[in-house]
C-alpha cells in the first residue's frame, strides 16, 4: 500500500478506506461499494491473483492510480470459499449509514472477519469434516495446545511433553488455522500448515486467559472443568478465545465448556501410522479406499464428522467401548436400523445450524431445517423406548415442543435465502406485520384499477403503469400517443419509444407503498432477531440433543456396517495380546473382485514378535495393516472383520511401512526409515502394537541386516511389544532359536514353471524362498533381463556354496558384532564412571562399594 504520509491528499472515500484498512492490516478488506465489494492497493493485487479476477484502476487518489479489484455482492460466498480454502482471512466491510442523510462517504464498518478456522457459513465449510482452529504455546521443550470447533462449540486443551507429541496431535486434528506465539522457537513444526497466524506474547498471559474463560463460562474458577492445572494449555486457550471473539464481533454462547484431553485416555497414533493405515486419507491424498470410506455410511453430516473423530482418536476406556458395543448389538437384535436411519436423515446438520443460531447468522432455511430436525425427535424417542439400553440415551434429549411450535408459527415452509429479502415470517404470526404487508401487497390491485381508470379518462389504449428502482411508479405512454397526455401529467423520463409521467395521486401512493414495504422489512428483521432471543436460552439443551443424535447416527451406522459386511463383536481382555481368528482387511476385501483370504493372528506374552517372510505381493503388508485396523476398529467400539477377536490392552499403534524420501527436509529414504524406527524404539511399550516392514533397506546388506537384527532383538527382549516384523533378510528366521518370544510365519506361494500363484494364506514357519524373479516377470520385466538374472542367481548360489562357512555364520557374526558393541558400551560406561571418581575423597567402604559396582557394570 502507498505510504500513509500522503493520507491528507486522498479523497474522502479513500481516507475512510485507509482508516478501516489500518485497523485490519493482516486480512483482505472487502469494502462494500453499492452492488460490489471492492479491494484496493495490495489487497486488490493479491485478490486478483488468488481469485483470477481482473485487476483494474479506480481513478486517482493522492495523485496516484488506485489498483482495484471487485466482486458482485450476490456472489461473495463463492469467492470467500476459495479464499478460505487457501488459508486467507477476509474482513467484510458493510455500509451501515443511510446514503440519503450522509454528508460525505456513507458510514461503513467491519461487520465480521471470515477466517478459515472461525467460519460458520454452510457454503464455506466441508460438510463431513471437522473445521478446527488451534493455538500453540511453547515453554522450554513443552507445549500447550488449544483446539476449538467454532461450528459446534467444542473447546479442548492438552499439554504435550515434546515436539514429536505435538506433531502427532497436529496431524490428528489437521487445523485449518493455527495461531502461535511470536516466541515460538520450533517454527519448523508448523511450516506445512496453512492459515498460520503470529500472535503477540501478551495474548498468552495466564491471568488474562483465566479471566477470559471464566467470563465466557460464567464461572468463578475453572476447577469444575478439571483444567486448572494445565497452565500451558490455558495460556493457549486464552489467546484462542480472544481471537475468536475478535473475528466474530459477537457473543459466543455456544462455547459453554472446556475440557482437558490426556494422552492416557486414548490409543496414541503418530502421523506416520495415520498415513500408512490410510484412516481418512489415502496415500495419494484422496478419500477413496480408506477406512472411513468403508465405515462411514452415516445419514447426517454431524454423524460422519463424529465417526472420523472416533477413528482418529480411539479410546482406552473399556467401559465406554462395551457401552457402544451393547448399543450396536441391541440395534441389530431389535431390527431398528431401518426404522431409525430415515428419521435421522431428516435431522440433518443440527450441530452446525445451532452454531449459526448462537452467532445470530442463521439464515431462514437454517431455521426450517432446525424445525424439521425437532419434528423428528418424538418419533426417534418412540423408537428408542423399545430398547431398555437406550432409555438413558433418550433422556439426554429434552422436550423441545415449545421451540418447535415457535418455528412452526413463525417461519413459512419455503422461505427465501436471506431475511433482507422479506417474506420469511409466516402470515398470522404478527398482526402489525400483516397490516403493513396488506397495504404493500394491495398495491397490485390499486395500480390495476388506476391503470384502467386513466385509460378510460384519456382514451389512450397503450397507457400502462410501471415501476423501477430509480424513478419509482410512473405512467407510460407510447411516443405515437404522447400528444394525448393530459396537462396534469408531469413528464418524468423520455425514452426512444415511450414517455413516462407522474401524477400527484400516483406519487402519494408510491410514498405510502414504499413506506409500507420499508416498515414491513424492518419489522420482519426485528421479529427474526426475536426468534434467536427465544431459542438461545435453550441452546445448551439443543446442543446436547444434537450431540446425542450424532452419536445415535454413528452407532446405527456401525450396526448397519456390521450386518452388511459380516463383522463380529470383539471381546476385550485384561491380558496383553491379540487373538484374531480369520481376520480380514476391511478396505481390501471391499475392493477385491475375488474373495478375500482371511488369516489369523496370535500375539501374547509368550509369542510377542512374528518374523513374517514370503514373496513381494504375497500379502505381508496387507496382513500387518489388517491387524492394526481390526485393533483400531475394536477401540472405537465397532464390530470387526473376523470370525472372532480377543483384544488386550493397547496404548499405541506404530507402523514402519513403505518407503519414501523427504526431499523438502533433505532426508533420504533410509534417513526417514531410521527416524521412524528410532521413534518406535523410544516410545513403544509392552502394550504397543508395532508393525515393521522391511527395515534396513537403503544401505549395505550387512548394515541393513545388523540393524534389522538389533531392532528385532530390542523389540522382543527389552520392550516386549506386540510386533509384526516383515523382512526379506532370511537370516532373521533363525532368531526364534536364539530369542524367546519370537516366532516365524510366512505368506504362502506356489511356483510352476515360469509362473507364480500367491496363496495369501499365513502359515507357521519361515518361507522357503523369496520368488523375486517370478514377481519381476509378473511386473513385466523383459524376458531377456529375467533370463540374465536367473543365470546370475545360479552363479551367486554356486559362490555361496563355495563359501558355505561364511554364509552359515552371517547371523553368528552379526550377533557377535552386536555383543562386542554391548561390551564396548559397558567398558565405555566404566571408563566414564572412573573419570568422575576422586580416590582421595573415598572412604575404604565407599571404595569397596564402587569396585563392586564397576564389576557389575562390566558383567
Swiss-Prot record:
ATP binds at residues 614-621. GO terms for cellular component: cytosol. This is DNA mismatch repair protein MutS. SUPFAM superfamilies: DNA repair protein MutS, domain I (SSF55271), DNA repair protein MutS, domain II (SSF53150), DNA repair protein MutS, domain III (SSF48334), P-loop containing nucleoside triphosphate hydrolases (SSF52540). This protein is involved in the repair of mismatches in DNA. It is possible that it carries out the mismatch recognition step. This protein has a weak ATPase activity. GO terms for biological process: mismatch repair. The gene is mutS. Belongs to the DNA mismatch repair MutS family. HAMAP family: MutS (MF_00096). The keyword Nucleotide-binding applies. Pfam families: MutS_I, MutS_II, MutS_III, MutS_IV, MutS_V. Keywords: ATP-binding, DNA damage, DNA repair, DNA-binding, Nucleotide-binding.
Amino acid at each position: 500500500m502507498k505510504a500513509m504520509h500522503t493520507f491528507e491528499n486522498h479523497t474522502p472515500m479513500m481516507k475512510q478506506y485507509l482508516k478501516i484498512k489500518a485497523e485490519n492490516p493482516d486480512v483482505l478488506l472487502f469494502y462494500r461499494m453499492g452492488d460490489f465489494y471492492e479491494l484496493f492497493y495490495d489487497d486488490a493485487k493479491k485478490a486478483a491473483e488468488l481469485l483470477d479476477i481482473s485487476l483494474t484502476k479506480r481513478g486517482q487518489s493522492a495523485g496516484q492510480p488506485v489498483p482495484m479489484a471487485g466482486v458482485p455482492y450476490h456472489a461473495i460466498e463463492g469467492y470467500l470459499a476459495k479464499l478460505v480454502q487457501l488459508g486467507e482471512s477476509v474482513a467484510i466491510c458493510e455500509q451501515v449509514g443511510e446514503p440519503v442523510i450522509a454528508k460525505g462517504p456513507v458510514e461503513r464498518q467491519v461487520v465480521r472477519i471470515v477466517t478459515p478456522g472461525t467460519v460458520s457459513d454452510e457454503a464455506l465449510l466441508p460438510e463431513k469434516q471437522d473445521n478446527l482452529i488451534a493455538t500453540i504455546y511453547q515453554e522450554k521443550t513443552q507445549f500447550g495446545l488449544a483446539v476449538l470447533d467454532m461450528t459446534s462449540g467444542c473447546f479442548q486443551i492438552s499439554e504435550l511433553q515434546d515436539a514429536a507429541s505435538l506433531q502427532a496431535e497436529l496431524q490428528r486434528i489437521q487445523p485449518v488455522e493455527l495461531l502461535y506465539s511470536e516466541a515460538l522457537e520450533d517454527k519448523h513444526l508448523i511450516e506445512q500448515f496453512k492459515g498460520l497466524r503470529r500472535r503477540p506474547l501478551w495474548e498468552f498471559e495466564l491471568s488474562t486467559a483465566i479471566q477470559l474463560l471464566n467470563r465466557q463460562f460464567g464461572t468463578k474458577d475453572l476447577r469444575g472443568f478439571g483444567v486448572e492445572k494445565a497452565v500451558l494449555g490455558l495460556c493457549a486457550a486464552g489467546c484462542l478465545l480472544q481471537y475468536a471473539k475478535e473475528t466474530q464481533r459477537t457473543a459466543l454462547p455456544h462455547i459453554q465448556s472446556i475440557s482437558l484431553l490426556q494422552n492416557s485416555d486414548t490409543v496414541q497414533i503418530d502421523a506416520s501410522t495415520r498415513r500408512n493405515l490410510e484412516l481418512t486419507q489415502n496415500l495419494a491424498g484422496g478419500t477413496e479406499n480408506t477406512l472411513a470410506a468403508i465405515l462411514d455410511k452415516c445419514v447426517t453430516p454431524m454423524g460422519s464428522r463424529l465417526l472420523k473423530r472416533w477413528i482418529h482418536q480411539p479410546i482406552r476406556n473399556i467401559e465406554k467401548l462395551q457401552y457402544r458395543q451393547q448399543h450396536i448389538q441391541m440395534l441389530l437384535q431389535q431390527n431398528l436400523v431401518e426404522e431409525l436411519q430415515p428419521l435421522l436423515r431428516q435431522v440433518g446438520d443440527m450441530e452446525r445450524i445451532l452454531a449459526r443460531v448462537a452467532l445470530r447468522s442463521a439464515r431462514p432455511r437454517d431455521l426450517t431445517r432446525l424445525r424439521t430436525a425437532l419434528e423428528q425427535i418424538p418419533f426417534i424417542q418412540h423408537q428408542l423406548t423399545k430398547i431398555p439400553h437406550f432409555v438413558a440415551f433418550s433422556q439426554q434429549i429434552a422436550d423441545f415442543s415449545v421451540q418447535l411450535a415457535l418455528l412452526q408459527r413463525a417461519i413459512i415452509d419455503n422461505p427465501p435465502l436471506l431475511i433482507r429479502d422479506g417474506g420469511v415470517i409466516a402470515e398470522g404470526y404478527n398482526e402489525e406485520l400483516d397490516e403493513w404487508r396488506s397495504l404493500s401487497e394491495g398495491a397490485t390491485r390499486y395500480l390495476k384499477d388506476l391503470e384502467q381508470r386513466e385509460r378510460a379518462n384519456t382514451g389512450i389504449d397503450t397507457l400502462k403503469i410501471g415501476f423501477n428502482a430509480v424513478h419509482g411508479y410512473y405512467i407510460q405512454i407510447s411516443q405515437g400517443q404522447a400528444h394525448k397526455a393530459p396537462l396534469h401529467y408531469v413528464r418524468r423520463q423520455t425514452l426512444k419509444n415511450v414517455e413516462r409521467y407522474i401524477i400527484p395521486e400516483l406519487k402519494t401512493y408510491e410514498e405510502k407503498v414504499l413506506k409500507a414495504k420499508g416498515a414491513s422489512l424492518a419489522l420482519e428483521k426485528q421479529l427474526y432477531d426475536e426468534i434467536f432471543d427465544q431459542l438461545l436460552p435453550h441452546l445448551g439443551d439443543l446442543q446436547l440433543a444434537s450431540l446425542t443424535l450424532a452419536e445415535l447416527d454413528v452407532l446405527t451406522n456401525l450396526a448397519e456396517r456390521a450386518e452388511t459386511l459380516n463383522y463380529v463383536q470383539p471381546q476385550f481382555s485384561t491380558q496383553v495380546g491379540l487373538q484374531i481368528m480369520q481376520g480380514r482387511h476391511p478396505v481390501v476385501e471391499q475392493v477385491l473382485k475375488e474373495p478375500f483370504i482371511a488369516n489369523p493372528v496370535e500375539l501374547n506374552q509368550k509369542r510377542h514378535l512374528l518374523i513374517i517372510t514370503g514373496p513381494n505381493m504375497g500379502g505381508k503388508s496387507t496382513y500387518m495393516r489388517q491387524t492394526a485396523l481390526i485393533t483400531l476398529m475394536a477401540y472405537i467400539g465397532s464390530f470387526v472383520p473376523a470370525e472372532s477377536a480377543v483384544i488386550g490392552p493397547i496404548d499405541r499403534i506404530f507402523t514402519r511401512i513403505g518407503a519414501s524420501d523427504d526431499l523438502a527436509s533433505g532426508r533420504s529414504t533410509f534417513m526417514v526409515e531410521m527416524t521412524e524406527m528410532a521413534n518406535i524404539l523410544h516410545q513403544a511399550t509392552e502394550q504397543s502394537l508395532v508393525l515393521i516392514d522391511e527395515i534396513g533397506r537403503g544401505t549395505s546388506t550387512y548394515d541393513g541386516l545388523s540393524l534389522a537384527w538389533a531392532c528385532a532383538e530390542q523389540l522382543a527382549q527389552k520392550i516386549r511389544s506386540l510386533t509384526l516384523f516383515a523382512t526379506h533378510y532370511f537370516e532373521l528366521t533363525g532368531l526364534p532359536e536364539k530369542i524367546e518370544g519370537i516366532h516365524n510365519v510366512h505368506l504362502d506361494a506356489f511356483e510352476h514353471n515360469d509362473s507364480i500363484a500367491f496363496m495369501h494364506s499365513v502359515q507357521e514357519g519361515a518361507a522357503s524362498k523369496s520368488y523375486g524373479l517370478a514377481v519381476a516377470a509378473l511386473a513385466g520385466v523383459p524376458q531377456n533381463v529375467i533370463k540374465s538374472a536367473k543365470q546370475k542367481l545360479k552363479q551367486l548360489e554356486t559362490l555361496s556354496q563355495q563359501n558355505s562357512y561364511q554364509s552359515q555364520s552371517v547371523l553368528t557374526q552379526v550377533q557377535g558384532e552386536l555383543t562386542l558393541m554391548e561390551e564396548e558400551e559397558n567398558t565405555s560406561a566404566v571408563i566414564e564412571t572412573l573419570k568422575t571418581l576422586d580416590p582421595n575423597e573415598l572412604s575404604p567402604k565407599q571404595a569397596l562399594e564402587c569396585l563392586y559396582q564397576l564389576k557389575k557394570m562390566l558383567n
